[in-house]
């Protein structure tokens, strides 16, 4: 955990807290988190929560990575963990993790226009990114990490030449399909992030095997020393934190495989990684430089969205939302932002087929790599788009994270109405409409005579009332 504040538009780190939970070590072959590891992680969230619970919403970002992506039973634990922490916890995709890692690392590197490789070893995944300056160009997240690799090949702590070779081969097999993308021919500088790589540098430096960073010669000597020791211990490796004993051999095998496959001669080490990337991403959101907005606009361009039509829907949304009361858990600005994004992207599915285009659009949004969006974010956006027309799938909102699981249904109805009112592209302006709304009642009041002049809108609203009725929502208008 990193605690920081903004001074003169610069991030100043105030405190760093770290606890070794090794969540991946508690993942069973059936992809369930054991009760013991759940409790250990929950206890950690309680301790972190003491520091963070008093901070205002929007000032904290907490993310879960590979293990929470893989675990089948992460949902109930996540709910308890968010309560303990006092803030939402987002599960992010591997590609999004890679983007954030690069963002964190690149802040400490010069803007020299040179291509660099960034590598980060986590507990259950390893990320590789090639980028220039602040821009990532190629990103991959491979399902191998220091914890998972150590459990698979060094579970009892014993290290031998045969075991280590098998671990290196296993890592090479994961890396093989992407070897050509990240080979040393593709970049000028290799940079490592994460505790495993920093620990490796520390071991090499203390032994005089590498003056700075990780050299291939020093790495080979360290691998031999680890194998000769037979198992990690304090007497042979006094610089190594005992908490890292269980996970370090697997991480070292991943480093060895990477150096061999990509023909790396030397790698420098960065202090920045995922947490620093999250800080800079959060700063961007605060300063209205939200990468999610760029992602939405890129999607809109890719799927040929009619920008003028989307803006008209957003204007009507704005008028309707201004008449609603909002709570502390979901403020007007946040609700408006999400509904604006959904309005922009609501018909991207037409690029696949007109029939069922709301379902096609939802599939794209749920499964595409969307920079800046967590898994829960993508599910929310997909649900809003899926529910914008035809039968109202109220049950989908139960799977959303708070507060959208409770309030999302009503706001989705507002989105439906705004889109419905602009169903005719010829109708560029909607008159002032009075909206009354609660969980089960929606009442629209139009200016006198307007509905009589727009019989198609009346027919659309009558049909909409039929769609909403099974969800126990009564729509009336006049």
Task: Please annotate each region the language model reported.
Residues 115-125, 129:
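A generic, well-ordered mixed alpha/beta core segment in the N-terminal half of proteins
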Residues 16-19:
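Short amphipathic
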Residues 3-8, 21-22, 26-55, 67-73, ...:
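Helical "lid/coupling" subdomains associated with nucleotide-phosphate turnover
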Residues 471-478:
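A short amphipathic beta-strand at an alpha->beta junction
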Residues 461, 470-471:
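C-terminal structured domains
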Residues 11:
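Active-site cofactor/substrate anionic-group-binding motifs, chiefly glycine-
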């Amino acid at each position: 955990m990193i605690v920081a504040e903004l001074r003169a538009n610069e991030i100043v780190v105030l405190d760093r807290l770290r606890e070794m939970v090794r969540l991946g070590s508690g993942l069973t072959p059936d992809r369930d988190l054991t009760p013991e590891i759940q409790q250990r992680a929950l206890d950690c969230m309680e301790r972190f929560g003491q520091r963070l619970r008093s901070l205002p919403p929007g000032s904290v970002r907490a993310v879960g990575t590979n293990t929470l992506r893989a675990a089948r039973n992460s949902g109930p634990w996540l709910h308890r963990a968010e309560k303990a922490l006092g803030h939402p916890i987002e599960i992010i995709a591997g590609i999004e993790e890679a983007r954030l890692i690069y963002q964190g690392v690149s802040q400490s590197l010069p803007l020299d226009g040179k291509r660099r490789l960034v590598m980060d070893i986590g507990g259950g995944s390893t990320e590789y990114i090639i980028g220039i300056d602040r821009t990532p160009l190629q990103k991959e997240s491979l399902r191998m990490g220091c914890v998972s690799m150590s459990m698979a090949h060094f579970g009892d702590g014993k290290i031998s030449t045969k075991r280590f070779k098998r671990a290196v081969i296993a890592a090479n097999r994961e890396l093989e399909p992407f070897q050509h993308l990240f080979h040393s021919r593709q970049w000028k500088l290799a940079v490592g992030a994460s505790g495993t790589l920093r620990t490796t540098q520390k071991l090499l430096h203390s032994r005089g095997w590498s003056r700075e960073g990780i050299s291939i010669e020093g790495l080979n000597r360290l691998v031999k020393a680890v194998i000769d020791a037979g198992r990690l211990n304090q007497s042979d490796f006094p610089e190594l934190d005992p908490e890292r004993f269980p996970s370090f051999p697997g991480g070292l095998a991943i480093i060895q495989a990477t150096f061999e496959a990509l023909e790396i001669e030397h790698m420098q080490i960065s202090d920045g990684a995922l947490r620093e990337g999250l800080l800079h991403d959060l700063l961007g959101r605060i300063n209205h430089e939200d990468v999610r907005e760029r992602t939405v606009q890129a999607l809109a361009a890719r799927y040929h969205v009619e920008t003028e039509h989307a803006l008209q829907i957003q204007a009507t949304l704005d008028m309707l939302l201004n008449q609603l009361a909002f709570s502390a858990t979901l403020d007007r600005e946040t609700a408006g932002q999400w509904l604006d994004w959904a309005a922009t992207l609501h018909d991207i599915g037409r690029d696949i087929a007109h029939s069922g285009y709301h379902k096609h659009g939802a599939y794209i949004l749920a499964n595409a790599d969307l920079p800046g969006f967590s898994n829960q974010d993508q599910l929310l956006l997909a649900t809003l788009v899926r529910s914008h027309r035809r039968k109202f799938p109220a049950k989908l909102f139960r799977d959303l994270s708070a507060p959208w699981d409770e309030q999302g249904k009503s706001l989705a109805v507002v989105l439906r109405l705004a889109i419905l009112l602009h169903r005719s592209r010829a109708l560029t302006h909607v008159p002032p409409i009075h909206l009354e709304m609660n969980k089960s009642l929606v009442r629209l009041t139009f200016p006198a005579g307007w509905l009589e002049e727009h019989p198609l809108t009346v027919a659309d609203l009558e049909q909409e009332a039929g769609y909403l009725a099974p969800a126990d929502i009564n729509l009336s208008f006049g």
